[in-house]
């Protein structure tokens, strides 16, 4: 602390002994030791306080750095969330538009077909299967419909019969009619 070597301390002791004398010298050394101890304690307290302040300042800097990083990430997340919401709204709008168009087309087909010709709208076939042209007529090769309600000749194409069998098996229905 004071950077005093052995020789410096010895010279100070000799001068103190000459000035104070041997009786007062012991008391002066004791008091000097007490003051030196108090000075060291005060110095160490100040040193530790400065170190704590530096640590607090470092923590503040680290906290501020983390806060900036968190703010940056939060802004990125909010930006991506807004973009995602915009895309989701666009997809939802597209699906709503397609649904409206399908509803309009179904209403248009129902009103265009009239109430008497329900079979042309697909209502006559209980299976819901119709030809692509919109009629209940069997395919050009002859054979039965998927429900098998017409009773046409059994000389249907083998592929048609296997399809009928597969459909009946999936529907959980009864046994297939054989003619």
UniProtKB/Swiss-Prot annotation:
Region Disordered: list its residue ranges. 75-179
Q: Where in the cell is it found?
A: Cell inner membrane
Among the GO molecular function terms of this UniProt record, one is:
protein transmembrane transporter activity
Q: Which GO terms describe its biological process?
A: protein transport by the Tat complex
Ranges annotated as biased composition (Basic and acidic residues):
75-86, 94-106
Q: Which domain of life is it from?
A: Bacteria
InterPro entries per UniProt: TatA/B/E, TatB
Q: Which UniProt keywords apply?
A: Cell inner membrane, Cell membrane, Membrane, Protein transport, Translocation, Transmembrane, Transmembrane helix, Transport
Which GO cellular component does the record give, naming just one?
A: TAT protein transport complex
Membrane protein topology class: Single-pass membrane protein
The annotated subunit structure for this chain is: The Tat system comprises two distinct complexes: a TatABC complex, containing multiple copies of TatA, TatB and TatC subunits, and a separate TatA complex, containing only TatA subunits. Substrates initially bind to the TatABC complex, which probably triggers association of the separate TatA complex to form the active translocon.
Task: Please explain the role this protein plays, according to its UniProt record.
Answer: Part of the twin-arginine translocation (Tat) system that transports large folded proteins containing a characteristic twin-arginine motif in their signal peptide across membranes. Together with TatC, TatB is part of a receptor directly interacting with Tat signal peptides. TatB may form an oligomeric binding site that transiently accommodates folded Tat precursor proteins before their translocation.
Q: What is this protein called?
A: Sec-independent protein translocase protein TatB
Instruction: Give the organism's phylogenetic lineage.
Output: Bacteria, Pseudomonadati, Pseudomonadota, Gammaproteobacteria, Chromatiales
